[in-house]
């Protein structure tokens, strides 16, 4: 132990001679601090740990990896953060770990670095303590991305080697194997990759679950068993339009939920895509745990400065330690903190050199087989704003007057499904005393696909709103069958969904309505719904008007206008 410690300290002095004033603790101190504070390693604290790896930031240690008595422990090198960051029930070397696990280590190092720099405080990094019951790891599989998993993946032109499955496909496949679902898929897809057209008719694809092994060891599985898992992996990859490569295949995590619902018969009404930066740490852990408990394994994804990685969260110990299956043949699978910091207050569009899974981390929850006709389940994407709601509070408004443009940083649909044609978007006014809700909305004439968005929104104060104090939020909902029939204000609070805003950004306002004057004040909280529309006289030719009835010759992109096309009159976003 002393020899290891001397080697580490000498190497740091050579790299960073001015580090004497830096805040860090030695490997020996870090190990004993962790052993004293964590009952998870109580039985091992008298053993002789081996320092496997040290990760530094700016030449100063941030965390240590120890192997001891057949276990691995990730331990903080700073006494201002939780002592134990993660642990696994077997030892491993950094030479063998997955890129996803390596990126998680970098995340922890970045967050510890922010504490040292003063941009995060100790109380933000306390180990979580909650009443969640333990959930043993749900996935028995220890799958990877190479043979036999990629045995039917495409071969890039001019190469003899098959492309890797991709971490997205491996994560999807392991969750689907847990459910042993579906027996056959539905729908079909074609897309271009590397000057080739990749196609699959999922309705003719059957999945041979009984012949898929939990662990594949070379020379210990049959051809039938190898093909069974390889075909599943290929179907998952094609379903998310995988960009295949022999150096590493990739796909957008935002497409996972859509593929599961559209091609693999998972319950569309349960699937949700969540972004980490829009929720507190408590909210995030509660949603992940709730899905684990009620639906099964969750797919997590994180963006680091080295790219994105998808992996499976399939269990829970306690105090915030979730079981992670990294999709690397079982290597480094274990219990880890999802994060030790709440999301950065600067939001997604903020500046700075932020890196790690706490930045642009996301999750696909509610992965459960459809128990009925999946085509009839509700199916709508989630809108995320990349910045604040940003309503001008320096002026007063009147009912019918347009507020905006706001949300100039953009609002995007991150799935799992496209927003249908005529999806409604409006400012929802909810009376804080009576609960009455008013909303005037526009519609998306062409819908909004996954990964598409808009900015510079302008929307009116609802007509007919009564005096009182209201909460104002930006809300949307699926098209309503009777939307064109309403020509009078009506209270209708069904089906409205929140547009999500990053933690730390203004997401809502307080509006005081008195004798027809609306005063808006900055006051963040979350939303609810209603609607009201009014129609202008029909015209025989397509024309555009603003919400005050003045004709517009050249509407601006993102502007809410009234379109008259023959006898049809509706509000739309250009």
Where are these regions (language model features)?
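C-terminal outer-membrane/trafficking sorting elements
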Residues: 18-19, 527-574
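Aromatic sugar-binding surface patches on proteins
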Residues: 445-460
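Active-site-adjacent substructure of cysteine-protease-like catalytic cores
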Residues: 47-69, 258, 262-325, 333
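Surface-exposed, short loops/turns at beta-strand junctions within beta-sandwich domains
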Residues: 460-469, 554-557
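Cys-His-centered catalytic/binding microenvironment captured across papain-like cysteine peptidases
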Residues: 23-59, 73-74, 79-141, 293, ...
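Short beta-strand elements
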Residues: 480-527
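Residue-level detector of functionally pivotal "anchor" positions at catalytic/ligand-binding pockets or at interdomain
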Residues: 361-387, 523-550
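Active-site-adjacent structural segments surrounding the nucleophilic cysteine of cysteine proteases
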Residues: 81-249
